[in-house]
């Protein structure tokens, strides 16, 4: 009897020693869009300055600070938030789609015990980014137009009152096809953005947790999202410039010039430096936007787990 007890004590049941398997949590589809809306509200003035620099005409300020001062002086404080409704609409369509599909693909094809590799993440991010780019294109056209409108001569301004008014006006005056102007460069940019932002964030976060011994807290989220923002800005800069030029073109310019023609024209006039025109304001905007997006997203997830008792 004693020997049996001794044997039982020296060989406890395996279940007692086995670590509990990691539990997969299925988060709501809309979390990425919600987090991106919060981030857009915080960083919108930086996005507006980036667009103004990319589309500036002769005599317009050529620096970020100069553009800030110019907008504030001519349009007031709320001029820095011109086009905010379109920016929010864009996040509700574009970011909800790309984040949602990306997370669904991760949930379907991976498990907590077998995290996806970099190339798997890139493939999933590319697919979700392309679909998100198409879904968000109408709002993206509006966003770019509303941000750059005040920089145009009064006779050329479109004067959209808000995102809904802009959608109705564009459809009525330019036809439904105008909502998808620049859809190919925009979808290409969305692929690059989602790949360099979401896939790199997951990769940098795993590196921080597994290789650097960091805890899963806001410091880690900040570090991983900062690096993801740097990568995303550099990768997306050339396509971002092309997208902005195409979307701000007049209907006549849009019909008469192809993407190849636009590339040839701006390279001849500006040299290859056009590819990184506005990189600094792009990073100053995209860096904080990426950081804010992922921190808001992680907080969404944290609150969800708390409410669900997970």
Swiss-Prot record:
InterPro entries: Mit_carrier (IPR002067), Mito_Metabolite_Transporter (IPR050391), Mitochondrial_sb/sol_carrier (IPR018108), Mt_carrier_dom_sf (IPR023395). It comes from the Eukaryota. Disruption phenotype: Leads to fluffy and albino colonies, and reduced conidia formation, when all 6 genes ctpA to ctpF are deleted. The keyword Translocase applies. It holds the Pfam family Mito_carr. Solcar repeats lie at residues 23-108, 115-207, 216-303. One of its GO terms (cellular component) is mitochondrial inner membrane. SUPFAM superfamilies: Mitochondrial carrier. Its EC number is 7.-.-.-. Keywords: Membrane, Mitochondrion, Mitochondrion inner membrane, Repeat, Translocase, Transmembrane, Transmembrane helix, Transport. The chain crosses the membrane at residues 29-49, 85-105, 122-142, 186-206, 222-242, 275-296. It is found in: Mitochondrion inner membrane. The keyword Nucleotide-binding does not apply. It is a multi-pass membrane protein. GO terms for biological process: transmembrane transport. Mitochondrial transporter that does not mediate citrate export from mitochondria to cytoplasm. Its exact function has still to be determined. Belongs to the mitochondrial carrier (TC 2.A.29) family. This is Mitochondrial citrate transporter F. It comes from Aspergillus niger (strain ATCC 1015 / CBS 113.46 / FGSC A1144 / LSHB Ac4 / NCTC 3858a / NRRL 328 / USDA 3528.7). The lineage of its organism: Eukaryota, Fungi, Dikarya, Ascomycota, Pezizomycotina.
């Amino acid at each position: 009897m004693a020997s049996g007890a001794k044997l039982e004590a020296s060989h406890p049941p395996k279940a007692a020693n086995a670590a509990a398997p990691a539990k997969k949590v299925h988060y709501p589809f809309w979390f990425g869009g919600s987090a991106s809306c919060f981030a857009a509200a915080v960083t919108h003035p930086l996005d507006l300055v980036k667009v103004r620099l990319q589309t500036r005409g002769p005599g317009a300020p050529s620096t970020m600070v100069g553009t800030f001062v110019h907008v504030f002086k001519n349009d007031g404080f709320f001029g820095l938030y011109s086009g905010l409704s379109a920016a929010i609409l864009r996040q509700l369509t574009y970011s909800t789609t790309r984040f949602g599909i990306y997370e669904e693909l991760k949930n379907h094809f991976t498990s907590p015990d077998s995290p996806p590799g970099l190339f798997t993440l890139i493939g999933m991010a590319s697919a979700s980014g392309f679909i998100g780019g198409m879904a968000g294109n109408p709002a993206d056209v509006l966003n770019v137009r509303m941000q750059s409108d005040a920089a145009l001569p009064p006779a050329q301004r479109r004067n959209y009152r808000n995102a809904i008014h802009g959608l109705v006006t564009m459809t009525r005056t330019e036809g439904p096809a105008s909502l998808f102007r620049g859809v190919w460069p925009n979808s290409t940019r969305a692929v690059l953005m989602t790949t360099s932002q979401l896939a790199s964030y997951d990769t940098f976060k795993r590196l921080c947790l597994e290789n650097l011994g960091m805890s899963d807290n806001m410091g880690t989220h900040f570090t991983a999202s900062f690096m993801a923002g740097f990568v995303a800005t550099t990768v997306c800069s050339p396509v971002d410039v092309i997208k902005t030029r195409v979307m701000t073109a007049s209907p006549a310019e849009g019909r008469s010039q192809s993407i190849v023609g636009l590339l040839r024209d701006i390279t001849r006039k500006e040299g290859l430096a056009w590819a990184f025109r506005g990189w600094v304001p792009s990073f100053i905007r995209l860096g904080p936007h990426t950081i804010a997006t992922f921190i808001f997203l992680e907080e969404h997830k944290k609150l969800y787990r708390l409410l669900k008792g997970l």
